[in-house]
Amino acid sequence: TRFTVVSGGAAVKDNQTGLIWEQEPDREHDVWSRSVARCATKEVGGQKGWRAPSVDELKTLIDTSQHDPALPAGHPFSNIKSEIYWTATPDPKDDIVAWQVSFFSGEPVTDQKSGTRRMWCVLGELRK
């Protein structure tokens, strides 16, 4: 199977990428800087070292054949909203903009960092 629930149910390992995701992303909507900082101080399932995902990492969860949310069928995540989630990836052309991923459409988008979005923290490194 693609996903394995770990850390007493608090996290999910993606066996395809090697990344470990929060089983349930933040419920709070916040600006980019606070969202990124919150990941860095999180402890999930007794594990530290969480961080905000890059746009490429967050896109690995997307299943474009699914919509609302655009996640693989049978995924073990909870409280997934078909909303736009922050990534740690700033727009290299504009300091006030960062990349986000829409879990309604599955598309990456950009918006100002002053907007409020949810964050889905990750642990580990993406296997190439």
Task: Say what each PLM segment does.
Residues 1-51, 55-128:
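Glycine-aromatic-enriched surface loops/turns that form tight recognition elements
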